[in-house]
Amino acid sequence: MPEEKLRKLDMVRETIRELRNLGIRGTLYSVVITRVGPWTLSYIKYDDGTIGCGCANNEAEREEIPDDVSFIKDLLNLNTYEVVDRLESFGDSVFINSLRTSIASALSYKLMNDVSLLKKEGYDAETFIAPNLPLFDPSKFVQPSDIVAMVGFHMTVTPLCADIAKEVLVTELMDLKELSVIELGVREKSNVKIFPADKSKEILSRADVVYITGETVVNGTIDEILEFSKNARTRIIYGSTSAFYPKVLFERGVDVSLPMIFPNTPDFRRRFVLSRGNWYFMRDVKQLLIRRSRT
């Protein structure tokens, strides 16, 4: 694979190497793919028989899921690291990246599902249960004088940040027309401004706090975003797509990880499938607040 493409997912590849070095082993057990959401949900079976699960956005609304994903059947029940090696031959599409990332999160499940293990690794880590999620409490990170940049508009978090911050600047890959609001008569004053993604360098370089969607991991923009935002006081990555062991994230410059952790139960998998991936209000979903070690 060309070097420039390898660079895209170095973060996930390095994370998988870290997990391998930690002695974490398992086989690919099951994969669920949805076009709504859209999500790739992977399950691995650890060598001790317990199950780990991990999810990643596959951006099906912008990049089509392959018509034929039957090749994944040939990967089931294989050693997870053999699966990852075989995926190298399938290119570096967003879908393949989402599969690789979801596998990395599934491999990370034992570490991420037990904050005591993360604390042993030297991280500050807390667990939160909906609706009391740290993602929905920007006062933990944002001050009234701050300029907040958000990589990706979030329908809940963007206005919450706007209630506190001096200014909220959003960069988006989607057509900005889709985020426009038509106001007739009374117009709301707003400290939120939305820009196309090609303005990212200009916007992120001004920010005190940066919220980064985990989707940037699968679309290959995460390293560029971290470079553009290197002057920020706090950089936060959030969501189910960034639910993997955070060592490499922190080494690259992320300060806070807010991953969503799904239950590994058959009941959750069934509800996920029947709802076509609408996990947002499902019971037993939790969020971690992990801060990188300052030592």
Where are the regions that the model predicts?
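Electropositive, gly/pro-rich neighborhoods at or near active sites that engage anionic ligands
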Residues: P2-I164, S293-R294
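Alpha-helix C-terminal capping/helix-to-coil transition sites in glycosyltransferase folds
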Residues: P144, S205-R206
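Structural motif
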Residues: I147, D208-V209
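A short acidic, amphipathic alpha-helical/loop segment
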Residues: V157-C161, T221-F228, V248
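Short, conserved loop/helix-junction motifs that constitute active-site signature segments
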Residues: C161-A165, S205, E227-A232
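NAD(P)-binding Rossmann-fold cofactor-contacting core
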Residues: V168-V186
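Short acidic low-complexity segments
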Residues: I194-S205
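C-terminal functional extensions of proteins
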Residues: T234-T295
